[in-house]
Amino acid sequence: MKTAHASRLPASDPFPLASHDHAGCVRDALSQAAALCERRGVRLTELRRRVLEIVWESHSPVGAYEIMERLPGERGRAAPPTVYRTLDFLCREGLVHRIDSLNAFVGCTAPEALHRALFLICRGCRNAAEIHDGTLEGSLERVAAAAGFGLERATVELTGLCAHCRGRA
Protein backbone atom coordinates (compact mmCIF):
# COMPACT_ATOMS: atom_id res chain seq x y z
CA MET A 1 0.00 0.00 0.00
CA LYS A 2 1.36 3.42 -0.88
CA THR A 3 0.88 6.83 0.64
CA ALA A 4 1.10 9.93 -1.47
CA HIS A 5 3.15 12.97 -0.59
CA ALA A 6 0.38 15.49 -1.20
CA SER A 7 2.59 18.51 -1.90
CA ARG A 8 4.17 16.78 -4.92
CA LEU A 9 0.94 15.66 -6.58
CA PRO A 10 -1.87 17.40 -8.43
CA ALA A 11 -4.69 18.38 -6.06
CA SER A 12 -7.19 16.56 -8.28
CA ASP A 13 -5.39 13.21 -7.81
CA PRO A 14 -3.73 12.71 -4.41
CA PHE A 15 -2.43 9.24 -5.33
CA PRO A 16 1.18 8.86 -6.47
CA LEU A 17 2.04 8.78 -10.14
CA ALA A 18 4.73 6.59 -11.68
CA SER A 19 6.72 9.74 -12.54
CA HIS A 20 6.51 11.01 -8.95
CA ASP A 21 9.88 12.01 -7.37
CA HIS A 22 9.94 9.44 -4.58
CA ALA A 23 13.54 10.10 -3.51
CA GLY A 24 12.70 13.80 -3.28
CA CYS A 25 9.80 13.03 -0.93
CA VAL A 26 12.07 11.10 1.41
CA ARG A 27 14.72 13.85 1.41
CA ASP A 28 12.12 16.57 1.96
CA ALA A 29 10.43 14.66 4.80
CA LEU A 30 13.70 14.03 6.65
CA SER A 31 14.90 17.61 6.19
CA GLN A 32 11.57 19.03 7.34
CA ALA A 33 11.52 16.67 10.35
CA ALA A 34 15.01 17.74 11.43
CA ALA A 35 14.07 21.42 11.19
CA LEU A 36 10.77 20.95 13.05
CA CYS A 37 12.40 18.97 15.87
CA GLU A 38 15.09 21.62 16.25
CA ARG A 39 12.48 24.42 16.42
CA ARG A 40 10.43 22.43 18.94
CA GLY A 41 13.45 21.64 21.10
CA VAL A 42 13.13 17.87 20.77
CA ARG A 43 15.80 15.45 19.60
CA LEU A 44 15.55 13.64 16.30
CA THR A 45 17.96 10.88 17.29
CA GLU A 46 19.58 8.65 14.70
CA LEU A 47 17.09 5.87 15.52
CA ARG A 48 14.11 8.22 15.20
CA ARG A 49 15.47 9.56 11.91
CA ARG A 50 16.05 6.04 10.57
CA VAL A 51 12.54 4.86 11.54
CA LEU A 52 11.07 7.94 9.87
CA GLU A 53 13.20 7.23 6.79
CA ILE A 54 11.93 3.63 6.65
CA VAL A 55 8.34 4.84 6.87
CA TRP A 56 8.88 7.30 4.02
CA GLU A 57 11.03 4.99 1.85
CA SER A 58 8.17 2.67 1.10
CA HIS A 59 5.50 5.36 0.67
CA SER A 60 3.35 2.55 2.03
CA PRO A 61 1.69 2.14 5.38
CA VAL A 62 4.31 0.09 7.21
CA GLY A 63 3.85 -2.02 10.33
CA ALA A 64 6.09 -1.91 13.38
CA TYR A 65 7.39 -5.44 12.80
CA GLU A 66 8.37 -4.59 9.22
CA ILE A 67 10.28 -1.60 10.59
CA MET A 68 12.00 -3.89 13.13
CA GLU A 69 13.12 -6.22 10.36
CA ARG A 70 14.65 -3.33 8.44
CA LEU A 71 16.48 -1.79 11.40
CA PRO A 72 19.97 -3.12 11.90
CA GLY A 73 20.70 -3.65 15.58
CA GLU A 74 23.83 -4.39 17.52
CA ARG A 75 22.45 -7.83 18.41
CA GLY A 76 20.12 -8.53 15.52
CA ARG A 77 16.92 -6.61 14.93
CA ALA A 78 15.61 -3.83 17.17
CA ALA A 79 13.37 -4.84 20.09
CA PRO A 80 9.61 -4.18 19.79
CA PRO A 81 9.46 -1.74 22.76
CA THR A 82 12.22 0.37 21.17
CA VAL A 83 10.42 0.62 17.84
CA TYR A 84 7.06 1.33 19.47
CA ARG A 85 8.55 4.10 21.66
CA THR A 86 10.14 5.60 18.57
CA LEU A 87 6.86 5.46 16.63
CA ASP A 88 5.06 7.04 19.62
CA PHE A 89 7.52 9.94 19.54
CA LEU A 90 7.10 10.38 15.77
CA CYS A 91 3.29 10.34 16.16
CA ARG A 92 3.36 12.83 19.07
CA GLU A 93 5.48 15.20 17.00
CA GLY A 94 3.12 14.85 14.04
CA LEU A 95 5.78 13.35 11.77
CA VAL A 96 3.86 10.12 11.17
CA HIS A 97 0.25 9.00 11.44
CA ARG A 98 -1.10 5.64 12.53
CA ILE A 99 -3.71 4.13 10.22
CA ASP A 100 -5.70 2.10 12.72
CA SER A 101 -7.55 -0.11 10.23
CA LEU A 102 -4.22 -1.30 8.81
CA ASN A 103 -2.27 -1.28 12.09
CA ALA A 104 0.41 0.61 10.17
CA PHE A 105 2.17 3.97 10.01
CA VAL A 106 2.62 6.53 7.24
CA GLY A 107 4.61 9.73 6.96
CA CYS A 108 2.64 12.92 7.57
CA THR A 109 2.47 15.20 4.54
CA ALA A 110 1.96 18.36 6.64
CA PRO A 111 3.84 17.93 9.94
CA GLU A 112 4.29 21.66 10.51
CA ALA A 113 0.63 22.21 11.40
CA LEU A 114 -1.74 20.56 13.87
CA HIS A 115 -4.44 18.87 11.81
CA ARG A 116 -6.81 15.94 11.71
CA ALA A 117 -5.56 13.00 9.65
CA LEU A 118 -7.80 12.21 6.70
CA PHE A 119 -6.96 9.21 4.50
CA LEU A 120 -8.33 7.83 1.27
CA ILE A 121 -7.53 4.11 1.13
CA CYS A 122 -8.01 2.31 -2.19
CA ARG A 123 -9.14 -1.29 -1.80
CA GLY A 124 -8.10 -2.00 -5.41
CA CYS A 125 -4.43 -1.01 -5.61
CA ARG A 126 -4.07 -0.67 -1.81
CA ASN A 127 -2.65 2.85 -2.16
CA ALA A 128 -3.43 5.41 0.54
CA ALA A 129 -3.38 9.20 0.32
CA GLU A 130 -3.46 11.78 3.11
CA ILE A 131 -5.75 14.65 2.23
CA HIS A 132 -6.40 17.96 3.94
CA ASP A 133 -9.92 19.40 4.09
CA GLY A 134 -10.58 22.27 6.48
CA THR A 135 -14.34 21.92 6.06
CA LEU A 136 -14.35 18.29 7.16
CA GLU A 137 -11.93 19.01 10.01
CA GLY A 138 -14.17 21.86 11.17
CA SER A 139 -17.22 19.61 11.01
CA LEU A 140 -15.53 17.01 13.21
CA GLU A 141 -14.67 19.67 15.78
CA ARG A 142 -18.20 21.16 15.73
CA VAL A 143 -19.86 17.75 16.19
CA ALA A 144 -17.55 16.94 19.10
CA ALA A 145 -18.07 20.35 20.73
CA ALA A 146 -21.87 20.09 20.36
CA ALA A 147 -21.69 16.83 22.32
CA GLY A 148 -19.57 18.50 25.01
CA PHE A 149 -16.60 16.43 23.90
CA GLY A 150 -13.05 17.81 23.87
CA LEU A 151 -11.60 16.38 20.67
CA GLU A 152 -7.89 15.61 21.02
CA ARG A 153 -7.19 13.31 18.10
CA ALA A 154 -9.10 12.24 15.01
CA THR A 155 -8.17 10.02 12.12
CA VAL A 156 -10.67 9.53 9.33
CA GLU A 157 -10.13 6.58 7.00
CA LEU A 158 -12.26 6.44 3.86
CA THR A 159 -12.10 3.20 1.88
CA GLY A 160 -13.07 2.92 -1.78
CA LEU A 161 -11.53 2.93 -5.26
CA CYS A 162 -9.10 5.54 -6.55
CA ALA A 163 -9.58 7.07 -10.02
CA HIS A 164 -6.99 4.72 -11.53
CA CYS A 165 -8.76 1.58 -10.22
CA ARG A 166 -12.22 2.90 -11.08
CA GLY A 167 -10.97 3.42 -14.64
CA ARG A 168 -9.90 -0.23 -14.83
CA ALA A 169 -13.25 -1.57 -13.61
Segments from the language model and where they lie:
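Pre-recognition alpha-helix immediately N-terminal to the DNA-recognition helix
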Residues: 49-54
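Short coil turns linking two alpha-helices in DNA-binding domains
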Residues: 79-80
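Short helix-coil-helix linker/hinge
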Residues: 44-47
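N-terminal leader segment of winged-helix/HTH proteins
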Residues: 1-41
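Basic amphipathic alpha-helical segments that dock to polyanions
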Residues: 83-93
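A short acidic, leucine-rich amphipathic alpha-helix
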Residues: 66-72, 83
